[in-house]
């Protein structure tokens, strides 16, 4: 199992994200999330990643309900939004995305995910359910609920 590290919000993190911008889908770019927040490293950073050597190979953001949206699931007091899960092509098929999902599940809170870029089946494979709704961009909304 890989070590999942919280990524600080600073210029170094922006440089690490550059590799993802070089190949990725523009919907997954995190540059806007970093703009204006790079004065000091933040202990409240929502960004997590897996390093392969000194290169960031996989990343995601875990946001709290209300950080980027209004309450979406009225059935839950609180939940996590798993946002922009991405693995660089040369590191795909090594289980890194699954490890990030398992890390998010370890908080034992409901998780909302958006099925972008053909990821819906991946989330379904990991126990998420399709809530039969679309976000404002037309992507599928999925939910994982912990067993209580």
Curated annotation (Swiss-Prot):
UniProt KW Acyltransferase keyword: yes
One GO MF term: acyltransferase activity, transferring groups other than amino-acyl groups
Domain N-acetyltransferase: 7-148
Keyword Kinase assigned: no
EC number: 2.3.1.-
UniProtKB keywords: Acyltransferase, Transferase
InterPro entries, A to Z: Acyl_CoA_acyltransferase, GNAT_dom, YlbP
Group of enzyme by EC: transferase
Taxonomic superkingdom: Bacteria
PROSITE patterns, sorted: GNAT
Signal peptide: none
Descriptive protein name: Uncharacterized N-acetyltransferase SAV1176
Organism name: Staphylococcus aureus (strain Mu50 / ATCC 700699)
Taxonomic lineage from the root: Bacteria, Bacillati, Bacillota, Bacilli, Bacillales
């Amino acid at each position: 199992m890989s070590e999942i590290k919280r990524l600080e919000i600073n210029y170094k993190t922006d440089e690490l994200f550059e590799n993802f911008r070089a190949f990725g889908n523009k919907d997954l770019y995190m540059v806007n999330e970093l703009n204006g927040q790079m004065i000091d490293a933040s202990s409240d950073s929502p960004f997590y990643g897996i390093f392969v050597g000194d290169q960031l190979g996989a990343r995601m953001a875990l946001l709290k309900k209300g950080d980027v949206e209004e309450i979406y699931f009225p059935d839950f007091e609180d939940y996590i939004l798993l946002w922009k899960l991405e693995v660089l092509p040369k590191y795909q098929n090594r289980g890194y995305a699954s490890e990030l999902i398992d890390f998010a599940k370890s908080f034992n809170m409901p998780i909302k995910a958006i099925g972008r870029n053909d990821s819906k089946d991946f989330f379904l494979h990991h126990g998420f359910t399709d809530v039969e709704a679309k976000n404002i961009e037309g992507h599928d909304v999925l939910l994982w609920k912990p067993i209580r």
